[in-house]
């Protein structure tokens, strides 16, 4: 699965992860970050990645923002650029007994921290931009500093969206996951 954090003045960031379901280990294996570019530009770079035709992209609720000129939502602009966006925006996994999850940042951070401390979160050592941002991620007076956190946000979205991950040969459409033996018409 992959996840995007939208930006313009601050970077648009995308993180790709693989999930070993048997061992419950998350591997961050690729990332992309660029500012001051339009969705079609980012889309072409996303689509250069191997698996872009079947790896779903998780996106936050700000993907519903409309372009002032065209009226097209940000998520739709990425779909128009052939990016494999999930048909719904990111939500944290629902708590026990709940039907919907929220957008709490702490939920994702605690999940990532738990994975890091237990050896179930690994990042390829070639992802210099990711590690640069990770080293700067911090709190001040108990609150997260929301600067240069775009790759971390995308990582959080992806890590908490493992339930939407898929394998090669499976796809998503607006009704949900399609298995490898289901034709996309």
What annotation goes with each model-predicted range?
Residues 1-8, 59-60:
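Two-metal-ion RNase H-like nuclease active-site motif
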Residues 3, 131, 147-151:
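Alpha-helical architecture
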Residues 6-8, 137, 157:
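Aromatic side chains
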Residues 8, 19, 159, 163:
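Hydrophobic/aromatic-lined pockets within catalytic cores
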Residues 10, 74, 150-154:
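Catalytic-loop motifs flanking and including active-site residues across diverse enzymes
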Residues 12-17, 156:
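Short beta-strand scaffold segments in enzyme catalytic cores
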Residues 15, 22-146, 165-185:
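Mg2+-dependent endonuclease catalytic cores in nucleic-acid-processing enzymes, primarily RNase H-like
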Residues 150-165:
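Stable alpha-helical structural segments in soluble proteins, enriched in small hydrophobic residues
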């Amino acid at each position: 699965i992959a996840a995007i954090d939208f930006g313009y003045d601050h970077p648009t960031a995308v993180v790709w992860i693989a999930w070993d379901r048997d061992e419950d280990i998350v591997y961050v294996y690729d990332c992309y970050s660029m500012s001051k570019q339009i969705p079609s530009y980012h889309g072409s770079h996303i689509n250069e990645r191997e698996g872009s035709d079947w790896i779903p992209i998780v996106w936050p609720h700000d993907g519903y923002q409309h372009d002032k000129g065209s009226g097209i939502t940000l998520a739709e602009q990425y779909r128009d650029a052939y990016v494999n966006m999930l048909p719904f925006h990111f939500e944290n996994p629902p708590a026990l007994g709940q039907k919907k999850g929220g957008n709490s940042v702490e939920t994702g951070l605690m999940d990532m921290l738990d994975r890091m401390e237990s050896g179930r979160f690994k990042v390829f050592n070639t992802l210099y931009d990711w590690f640069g941002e990770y080293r700067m991620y911090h709190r001040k007076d108990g609150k997260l500093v929301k600067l240069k956190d775009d790759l971390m946000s995308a990582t959080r979205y992806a890590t908490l969206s493992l339930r939407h991950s898929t394998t090669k040969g499976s796809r998503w459409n607006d009704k949900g996951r399609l298995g490898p033996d289901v034709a996309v018409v």
